[in-house]
Amino acid sequence: MEHITTPKVENVKLLDRYTNRKAASGTLYLTATHLIYVDASAEVRKETWILHHHIATVEKLPLTTAGCPLLIHCKNFHVAHFVIGQERDCHEVYTSLLKLSQPVKPEELYAFSYNPKMSKDNREIGWKLIDLKVDYQRMGIPNDYWEITDLNKDYEVCNTYPPEIVVPRAASKATVIGSSRFRSRGRIPVLSYLYKENNAAICRCSQPLSGFSARCLEDEQMLQAIREANPGSPFMYVVDTRPKLNAMANRAAGKGYENEDNYDNIRFKFIGIENIHVMRSSLQKLLEVCETKSPSMSDFLTGLENSGWLRHIKAVMDASVFLAKAVKDEKASVLVHCSDGWDRTAQVCSLASLLLDPFYRAFKGFMVLIEKEWIAMGHKFSHRCGHLDGDPKEVSPVFTQFIECVWQLMQQFPCTFEFNEHFLLEIHDHVYSCQFGNFLGTCHKEREDLKIFEKTHSLWPFLLQKKQELRNPLYRGFTAYKELQPNTLPFSFQFWCGMYNRFDKGMHPKQCVLDHLLSCMNQKIKLEDNASELENKLPFLDGPLPNEACFLSKVGCAASKTPMLNTPQDYEGEAPPVLTNGISVGDINVTSDVDQRNKENLANHRDLHLNDSVDVLNSEAKDGKPQHH
């Protein structure tokens, strides 16, 4: 509170950046954690809350006749434009927000003061919900080829890896340590995902310290051990996710990429995902387009294209699809790296796992995926998200791109994810909110030093409490789809209004009024039809009679033979109109065109997997050992 000199300012206007209607007038409050604006002109009390940690920039605009404007841009893409009557009040609020939004010490972050009135035991249970050993066991590890080792328990192998890592059983301790000395920051090749169907593996690491000619026998042995852990393939891929020119430039600094002549039976491939600085610039250009007050459709589309944002999303998706196809179709193991192996590598390894394994498309599985590939493996959340007052060049929307890639997949396969768009937005918001300890720090060692697991709470129990509102009603369970094969042609990628224009009220100027009304009418009709069908199902909720249960069982068998549907376009004559949030109208009621028997089977199947997931979650929360990531 020492940073707050003016906790309350009255007669503050909140401008609507899309319309010319009269600005709201109210009172602005500054608390220890939030900026709160209370609209006094509204008939019903209306409040706008902005978490200090969500604030990306605060800008004092030139003085006007109406007062002193204050423009706030948030990391969750909320934009608030206030006009404060007195210049002195505006300056004091501006100064306070600069300090409150950019704390210097980790202990000043919201998570260390957040108190949800939860007992110490319940907090510990929350941190036990995700156990990565259980996920490795689900893959069949340990086995004859792979083992979980504690060689890094004192962080001597790599200080940004977790204490336990999965390496080939054939790799000796000397091989592991020798390889770590040849890899940037000691980030040796470790297992990310094992495809049990054919023993092909996705592994990850950082770039080698090869320069123009250096080599390392232990590193060559490590890659050989990874290749031999997959007897079904005579070769393995080594994928560098950087543009080739960037990787070659790193050679001059004594780093670079693997020389195929030094490694047996590897196939090297560059993918070409740009670095964090290009991505940061691209997002800024995208947001400038989104904030244009009255763009024409042509201007908006031109600006979207010039930002390059969707091209970068496509590049990440292309790399992930390549990994998934190499593992599934070619039965080859893949080793992935970028520069340090914690940005682009995390993106493509996690997305490839998501494409291959339906478990990661469920609530708990997605949490496990984030814990395993992002948190445990040392993605620098603190730096990339700008949690503390630091180098702005380290900030980059790497995790935002991952979340958007998942959303793009949800648009192509609306029945394959247990969760909906709001689940992704909740996670994205809390990556920046610093309300929970999961995303603080840069690696496991740093989180231990900060005593994150003793002093803060985990996000995952909080999200599970909201499971009902975050569930996708179209979800068909684990068995409906195994591997996903998305279309990555440019026209397959949509602009995500639900992310970048989420806080904009009313209709955007770039929308045609008639199209908007027609979309709303079509949506209303489909929802009414859906409501009628649900009313007809209500009698079944009391439980069917024995003979009815037998009938339903037979219906389920028949329905299982029905071909699965991917998208609404599969059973619509033409592509449905797209709503303002990026969701196609057909997605809202995709099951309305499926026969009644298939819907009953879908409902039964979804509930079965939901109950199974909850049972597993509860049992692990009670019995599992603490696994801090």
Curated annotation (Swiss-Prot):
<dbReference type="GO" id="GO:0052629">
    <property type="term" value="F:phosphatidylinositol-3,5-bisphosphate 3-phosphatase activity"/>
</dbReference>
<feature type="binding site">
    <location>
        <position position="343"/>
    </location>
    <ligand>
        <name>a 1,2-diacyl-sn-glycero-3-phospho-(1D-myo-inositol-3,5-bisphosphate)</name>
    </ligand>
</feature>
<feature type="binding site">
    <location>
        <position position="380"/>
    </location>
    <ligand>
        <name>a 1,2-diacyl-sn-glycero-3-phospho-(1D-myo-inositol-3,5-bisphosphate)</name>
    </ligand>
</feature>
<feature type="binding site">
    <location>
        <position position="250"/>
    </location>
    <ligand>
        <name>a 1,2-diacyl-sn-glycero-3-phospho-(1D-myo-inositol-3-phosphate)</name>
    </ligand>
</feature>
<feature type="binding site">
    <location>
        <position position="342"/>
    </location>
    <ligand>
        <name>a 1,2-diacyl-sn-glycero-3-phospho-(1D-myo-inositol-3,5-bisphosphate)</name>
    </ligand>
</feature>
<feature type="binding site">
    <location>
        <position position="341"/>
    </location>
    <ligand>
        <name>a 1,2-diacyl-sn-glycero-3-phospho-(1D-myo-inositol-3,5-bisphosphate)</name>
    </ligand>
</feature>
<feature type="binding site">
    <location>
        <position position="339"/>
    </location>
    <ligand>
        <name>a 1,2-diacyl-sn-glycero-3-phospho-(1D-myo-inositol-3,5-bisphosphate)</name>
    </ligand>
</feature>
<feature type="binding site">
    <location>
        <position position="276"/>
    </location>
    <ligand>
        <name>a 1,2-diacyl-sn-glycero-3-phospho-(1D-myo-inositol-3-phosphate)</name>
    </ligand>
</feature>
<feature type="binding site">
    <location>
        <position position="276"/>
    </location>
    <ligand>
        <name>a 1,2-diacyl-sn-glycero-3-phospho-(1D-myo-inositol-3,5-bisphosphate)</name>
    </ligand>
</feature>
<dbReference type="Pfam" id="PF06602">
    <property type="entry name" value="Myotub-related"/>
</dbReference>
<feature type="domain" description="Myotubularin phosphatase">
    <location>
        <begin position="126"/>
        <end position="500"/>
    </location>
</feature>
<dbReference type="GO" id="GO:0005737">
    <property type="term" value="C:cytoplasm"/>
</dbReference>
<feature type="binding site">
    <location>
        <position position="250"/>
    </location>
    <ligand>
        <name>a 1,2-diacyl-sn-glycero-3-phospho-(1D-myo-inositol-3,5-bisphosphate)</name>
    </ligand>
</feature>
<feature type="binding site">
    <location>
        <position position="275"/>
    </location>
    <ligand>
        <name>a 1,2-diacyl-sn-glycero-3-phospho-(1D-myo-inositol-3,5-bisphosphate)</name>
    </ligand>
</feature>
<feature type="binding site">
    <location>
        <position position="340"/>
    </location>
    <ligand>
        <name>phosphate</name>
    </ligand>
</feature>
<feature type="binding site">
    <location>
        <position position="343"/>
    </location>
    <ligand>
        <name>phosphate</name>
    </ligand>
</feature>
<feature type="binding site">
    <location>
        <position position="384"/>
    </location>
    <ligand>
        <name>a 1,2-diacyl-sn-glycero-3-phospho-(1D-myo-inositol-3-phosphate)</name>
    </ligand>
</feature>
<feature type="binding site">
    <location>
        <position position="340"/>
    </location>
    <ligand>
        <name>a 1,2-diacyl-sn-glycero-3-phospho-(1D-myo-inositol-3-phosphate)</name>
    </ligand>
</feature>
<dbReference type="InterPro" id="IPR010569">
    <property type="entry name" value="Myotubularin-like_Pase_dom"/>
</dbReference>
<feature type="binding site">
    <location>
        <position position="344"/>
    </location>
    <ligand>
        <name>phosphate</name>
    </ligand>
</feature>
<feature type="binding site">
    <location>
        <position position="342"/>
    </location>
    <ligand>
        <name>phosphate</name>
    </ligand>
</feature>
<dbReference type="GO" id="GO:0106018">
    <property type="term" value="F:phosphatidylinositol-3,5-bisphosphate phosphatase activity"/>
</dbReference>
<keyword id="KW-0539">Nucleus</keyword>
<feature type="coiled-coil region">
    <location>
        <begin position="517"/>
        <end position="543"/>
    </location>
</feature>
<dbReference type="InterPro" id="IPR011993">
    <property type="entry name" value="PH-like_dom_sf"/>
</dbReference>
<keyword id="KW-0175">Coiled coil</keyword>
<feature type="binding site">
    <location>
        <position position="344"/>
    </location>
    <ligand>
        <name>a 1,2-diacyl-sn-glycero-3-phospho-(1D-myo-inositol-3,5-bisphosphate)</name>
    </ligand>
</feature>
<feature type="binding site">
    <location>
        <position position="340"/>
    </location>
    <ligand>
        <name>a 1,2-diacyl-sn-glycero-3-phospho-(1D-myo-inositol-3,5-bisphosphate)</name>
    </ligand>
</feature>
<protein>
    <recommendedName>
        <fullName>Phosphatidylinositol-3,5-bisphosphate 3-phosphatase MTMR8</fullName>
        <ecNumber>3.1.3.95</ecNumber>
    </recommendedName>
</protein>
<comment type="similarity">
    <text>Belongs to the protein-tyrosine phosphatase family. Non-receptor class myotubularin subfamily.</text>
</comment>
<feature type="binding site">
    <location>
        <position position="342"/>
    </location>
    <ligand>
        <name>a 1,2-diacyl-sn-glycero-3-phospho-(1D-myo-inositol-3-phosphate)</name>
    </ligand>
</feature>
<dbReference type="Pfam" id="PF21098">
    <property type="entry name" value="PH-GRAM_MTMR6-like"/>
</dbReference>
<comment type="subunit">
    <text>Homodimer.</text>
</comment>
<keyword id="KW-0378">Hydrolase</keyword>
<dbReference type="GO" id="GO:0046856">
    <property type="term" value="P:phosphatidylinositol dephosphorylation"/>
</dbReference>
<feature type="binding site">
    <location>
        <position position="341"/>
    </location>
    <ligand>
        <name>a 1,2-diacyl-sn-glycero-3-phospho-(1D-myo-inositol-3-phosphate)</name>
    </ligand>
</feature>
<dbReference type="InterPro" id="IPR016130">
    <property type="entry name" value="Tyr_Pase_AS"/>
</dbReference>
<feature type="binding site">
    <location>
        <position position="344"/>
    </location>
    <ligand>
        <name>a 1,2-diacyl-sn-glycero-3-phospho-(1D-myo-inositol-3-phosphate)</name>
    </ligand>
</feature>
<dbReference type="InterPro" id="IPR030564">
    <property type="entry name" value="Myotubularin"/>
</dbReference>
<feature type="binding site">
    <location>
        <position position="343"/>
    </location>
    <ligand>
        <name>a 1,2-diacyl-sn-glycero-3-phospho-(1D-myo-inositol-3-phosphate)</name>
    </ligand>
</feature>
<dbReference type="InterPro" id="IPR029021">
    <property type="entry name" value="Prot-tyrosine_phosphatase-like"/>
</dbReference>
<feature type="binding site">
    <location>
        <position position="275"/>
    </location>
    <ligand>
        <name>a 1,2-diacyl-sn-glycero-3-phospho-(1D-myo-inositol-3-phosphate)</name>
    </ligand>
</feature>
